A protein has these predicted regions:
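Glycine-rich phosphate/pyrophosphate-binding loop and the adjoining helix
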Residues: 129, 137-167
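Short glycine/serine/threonine-rich phosphate/pyrophosphate-binding segments
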Residues: 18-23, 46-50, 71-78, 97-101, ...
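Glycine/charged-rich beta-loop-alpha catalytic/anionic-binding loops adjacent to active sites
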Residues: 7-8, 34-38, 85, 109-119
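Glycine-rich phosphate-binding loop
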Residues: 53-92
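Glycine-rich phosphate/diphosphate-binding loop of Rossmann-like nucleotide-binding domains
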Residues: 4-45
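Short, glycine-/small-residue-rich phosphate/pyrophosphate-handling segment
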Residues: 96-146
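N-terminal beta-loop-helix "entrance" segment that forms/cooperates
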Residues: 38-59
Length: 167
């Protein structure tokens, strides 16, 4: 686990079963040179730890928190209630869930004044959460802005190459 000081992004998930999906998020962040803090903290089973983590995040150098959970996915909202840092929510599917719809609604339906930027359910949402975190950080970081521009150009190039290969 990376030290909880001086890294700008934390990736927090409600269960170790979420790690498989969130690995894509972690790898996407690392591709931009960001080694995130990775934690397993449950909004329901470890609420005090969740509150303390969020309350101390800014003083520990964290600038953005990515929170992933399935089922009654309250993790992102519970963290958002305890900090003014941007929270990016990633709803996940679960074996006991409703295809991720339950987690999506739990993550996106926040009361006024407690915002959570909610991504798509699952792997696409995990990767987009990383990219969105980089976009937030790039507002004040010229190096990240360049890496982000290079990333977008590489995506464009891949699509153009695939298009030219279609019969």
């Amino acid at each position: 686990m990376v030290s909880e000081k001086n890294t700008p992004v934390a990736v927090v998930m409600g269960s170790d079963s979420d790690l498989d999906v969130m690995r894509g998020c972690i790898e996407q962040l690392e591709s931009f040179g960001i080694k995130p803090i990775v934690r397993i903290i449950s909004a329901h089973r470890t609420p005090k730890i969740a509150a303390e983590f969020a309350q101390n995040a800014a003083e520990n150098g964290i600038q953005v928190i990515i929170a992933a959970a399935g089922m009654a996915a309250h993790l992102a909202g519970a963290l958002a209630a305890q900090t003014s840092l941007p929270i990016i929510g990633v709803p996940l599917t679960s074996s006991a869930g409703l295809g991720g719809v339950d987690a999506l609604l739990s993550t996106v339906q926040m009361p006024p004044g407690v915002p959570v930027a909610t991504m798509a359910v699952g792997k696409a949402g995990a990767k987009n959460a990383a990219i969105f975190a980089v976009q937030i950080l790039a507002l004040a970081d010229e190096n990240l802005r360049k890496k982000l521009a290079d990333f977008k150009k590489a995506q464009e190039k891949k699509v153009i190459e695939k298009d030219s290969g279609v019969l």
